[in-house]
Amino acid sequence: MRTERQILFRGGMMMDIKAQAEKAEKLRKLHHGPRILALPNAWDAVSARILEEVGHPAIATSSAAVAFSLGYPDGQRISREEMLNAVDRITRAVRVPVTADLESGYGKTPEEIAEFTKAMVAAGAVGLNFEDVTGDDESTHVELGLQVKKIRAIRETSAALGVPVVINARTDVYLMPIGPEATRFERTVERLSAYRDAGADCLFAPGLCDREIIARLVKAVGAPLNILVSQGCPSLDELEKMGVARASAGSSAMRAAMGAFQRVAEDWLAHGSFDSLMKITVPYAELNRMMARPRS
């Protein structure tokens, strides 16, 4: 990561806190607009710039997609430094707000999360996804009280820095799944409500596509809700009518790009054909123009 974004925290030159705070506020307002905030997640500078070019008002990253692109499996296997470097490159590539998927924040204590929040802000992010799973099969969920303290640490630390980041607090009750099916809705509401009260701006329940449950959850949590879109989920228009504030794609956009690349590779071997390649190629001049714009 280039040092000038970190200098603020190392006793040197100051970064433009005012501009970053304005981006954070813009991102926050997008969760309360008349339209759903649709976020096909980016994984590198060029994917982020494409999203900005076609008109997306904010960029979200996908931790899985970033990890895959750098040669790692998902699940916080990529190092803290490599993840922050990737976020830094993305935030420098675009002018719109960037919210970063940072998994469980590379820390087990509120103090470690507070330090990570400083590094995240230094990387240019004005929002983050923050999840509540440990990765331990015997104790999948971070204890609720501890997770609440971590969210408060993010809120308080970012406010002290002058960049009140947008916290998208995630629970994986439905995604994992965790607990008997009959208890999952109540577990989800309990966790998301606690995260809301701790200072989260948006609440994220990946793995949930059932229309009735989504509608109930929107009413139960009383805060902007993020749904991870997947096969079988309601459309963006439907989600918007149900009151969902934000819809994200996770690693799906990156996997779609990789699926296209895989088909091209197979066509070259199996058929000696490059027709599929030519049909989906972004023109060289267009991509070069897009990337020639000065970085921030």
Regions found by a protein language model. Name each.
Residues 241-243, 263-264:
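Short, surface-exposed amphipathic charged segments that create phosphate/polyanion-binding patches used
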Residues 1-4, 40:
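Classical N-terminal secretory signal peptides
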Residues 36-37, 274:
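A general structural signal for well-ordered secondary-structure junctions
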Residues 3-14:
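Short, Lys/Arg-enriched N-terminal segments with co-localized hydrophobic residues
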Residues 16-20, 27, 252-296:
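Extended, intrinsically disordered, low-complexity segments
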Residues 18-30, 37-97, 104-227, 233-242, ...:
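Alpha/beta enzyme core
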